[in-house]
């Protein structure tokens, strides 16, 4: 009987959860859920100078926002250093590792010689078979793996296929530094083994690490987990992903108004495909996810596609859900718009009422918030240039003439206000747009908005009439 599937996401807390890390987490999560397994979360915080609590918090918050839950407690690699040392000592005792006393100067000379000879730098194994009695006094050694020097190391990768390295090109890597701290290579192997990881899914920049880690596994007599090294993400221009392309923290996507479901959907299609299907519910993703369907070429990040997909998710979301999502980004986006960091009950009610008309065009929650400007703008409304143009000439006098027809309405809703405005336009012998366009400008301060009669209904009688009076000449 095969072992239950266990995957892991293992970020280093030296910065935010970037988009590549988020996709790796998603792929691990989907694979575990697809096979009824577990996804574990390990924080690789052994770089004490660069690891920060703020980065750890950002990673955890980013994963929660994306809806990627992990199983069990978060595992911190640094806290397991004693276990890593114990394993290094066991390799020493079994003869699969040895003490190396090479000085920094000797190692630098090895690198210099390799460069001069046009080959990759590698440790030359000078302490591999030397008698420990030759060790220089007062020098603390490192512990190196006694790696195989002949033959090949092979990784059967679910994405990259069969990958082979000549062992002569893989030197005896350091397992334990002279100060007793474990290296990344050792810590990853020990942690993955102790956590019961059966499937490693990570970026293909770790492919060479897979060969070295396989050697450590075999030296310990442990099973090597299955491997899948996924292609990196590039910008739309094919260059390595940078901040200008979208290499931002997940929290930045949240604050820019992307929905977590839309970002999940976009990320799953970066490098993975299922026929020509573009839109996936979470359940569909889980059911369809297959490592064999991941391509080897770098995926290209395209903001236009992400925005289009986000707009699709906005249009398909319940109005109250969108208002809650807007509320969540107000701490980041509210103050610059003169809004509080949380919705008032009155504004929440107006947003829910206006949402059917607002969400049809918006591609992000920020666009949605800006298109709702008329709901929260203080009076008298600041007009944009196009609105000013619509309210020039005889437009104010036309609005003055319209006002009594609106004031006389016994019931105030989209249908009654539309009927009144249409009747007024007919009585004046003008087209509806000649009334509706300046009316929209006066009510919203903009030339574009949701349907103007919906705007009248959402604002309510008192606010709508007050805004019209603001635009009448004295």
From Swiss-Prot:
Keywords noted in UniProt: Aminoacyl-tRNA synthetase, ATP-binding, Cytoplasm, Ligase, Nucleotide-binding, Protein biosynthesis
Catalytic function, reaction form: tRNA(Glu) + L-glutamate + ATP = L-glutamyl-tRNA(Glu) + AMP + diphosphate
Listed CDD domains: GluRS_core (cd00808)
Keyword Nucleotide-binding annotated: yes
Region named Disordered: 113-136
Binding site for ATP: 243
Keyword Secreted: no
Subcellular location: Cytoplasm
Record InterPro entries: aa-tRNA-synth_I_cd-bd, aa-tRNA-synth_I_codon-bd_sub2, aa-tRNA-synth_I_CS, aa_tRNA-synth_I_cd-bd_sf, Glu-tRNA-ligase_bac/mito, Glu/Gln-tRNA-synth, Glu/Gln-tRNA-synth_Ib_cat-dom, GluQ/Sye
Main enzyme class: ligase
GO cellular component assignments: cytosol
Motif 'HIGH' region mapped to chain: 11-21
A GO biological-process term: glutamyl-tRNA aminoacylation
Enzyme Commission no: 6.1.1.17
Annotated family: Belongs to the class-I aminoacyl-tRNA synthetase family. Glutamate--tRNA ligase type 1 subfamily.
Function: Catalyzes the attachment of glutamate to tRNA(Glu) in a two-step reaction: glutamate is first activated by ATP to form Glu-AMP and then transferred to the acceptor end of tRNA(Glu).
Subunit composition and interactions: Monomer.
Classification via PANTHER family: GLUTAMATE--TRNA LIGASE (PTHR43311), GLUTAMATE--TRNA LIGASE, MITOCHONDRIAL-RELATED (PTHR43311:SF2)
HAMAP family reported in the protein's UniProt record: Glu_tRNA_synth_type1
Protein name as annotated: Glutamate--tRNA ligase 1
Gene: gltX1
């Amino acid at each position: 009987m095969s072992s239950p599937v266990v995957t892991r996401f293992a970020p280093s807390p030296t910065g935010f959860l970037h988009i590549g890390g988020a996709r790796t987490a998603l792929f691990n999560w989907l694979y575990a859920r697809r096979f009824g397994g577990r996804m574990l979360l390990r924080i690789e915080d052994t770089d004490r100078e660069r690891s920060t609590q703020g980065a750890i918090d950002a990673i955890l918050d980013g994963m929660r926002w994306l809806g990627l839950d992990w199983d069990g407690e978060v595992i911190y690699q640094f806290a397991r250093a004693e276990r890593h040392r114990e394993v290094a000592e066991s390799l020493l005792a079994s003869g699969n590792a040895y003490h190396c006393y090479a000085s920094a100067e000797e190692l630098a000379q090895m690198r210099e010689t390799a460069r001069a000879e046009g080959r990759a730098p590698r440790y030359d194994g000078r302490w591999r078979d030397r008698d420990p009695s030759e060790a220089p006094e007062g020098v603390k050694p490192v512990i190196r793996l006694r790696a195989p020097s002949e033959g090949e190391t092979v990784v059967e990768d679910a994405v990259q296929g069969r990958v082979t390295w000549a062992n002569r090109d893989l030197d005896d890597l350091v397992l334990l530094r002279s100060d007793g701290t474990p290296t990344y290579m050792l810590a990853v192997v020990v942690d993955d083994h102790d956590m019961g990881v059966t499937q490693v899914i990570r970026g293909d920049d770790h492919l060479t690490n897979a060969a070295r880690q396989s050697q450590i596994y075999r030296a310990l007599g442990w099973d090597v987990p299955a491997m899948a090294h996924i292609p990196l993400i590039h910008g739309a221009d094919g260059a390595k992903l940078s901040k200008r392309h979208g290499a931002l923290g997940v929290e930045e996507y949240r604050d820019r108004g992307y929905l977590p479901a839309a970002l999940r959907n976009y990320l799953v299609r970066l490098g993975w495909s299922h026929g020509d299907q573009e839109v996936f519910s979470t359940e569909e993703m889980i059911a369809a996810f297959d490592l064999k369907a991941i391509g080897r070429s770098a995926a290209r990040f395209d903001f236009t596609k992400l925005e289009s997909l986000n707009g699709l998710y906005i249009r398909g979301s319940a109005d109250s859900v969108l208002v809650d999502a807007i509320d969540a980004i107000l701490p980041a986006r509210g103050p610059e718009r003169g809004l509080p960091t949380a919705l008032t009950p009155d504004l929440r009610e107006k947003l829910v009422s206006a949402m059917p008309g607002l969400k049809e065009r918006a591609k992000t929650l920020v666009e949605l918030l800006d298109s709702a400007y008329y709901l929260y703008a203080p009076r008298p409304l600041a007009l944009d240039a196009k609105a000013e143009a619509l309210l020039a000439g005889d437009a104010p006098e036309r609005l003055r003439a319209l006002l009594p027809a609106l004031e006389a309405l016994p019931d105030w809703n989209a249908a009654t206000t539309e009927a009144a405005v249409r009747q007024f336009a007919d009585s004046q012998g003008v087209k509806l747009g000649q009334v509706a366009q300046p009316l929209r400008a006066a009510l919203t301060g903009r030339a574009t908005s949701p349907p103007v009669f919906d705007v009248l209904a959402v604002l309510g009688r008192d606010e709508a009439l007050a805004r019209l009076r603001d635009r009448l000449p004295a």
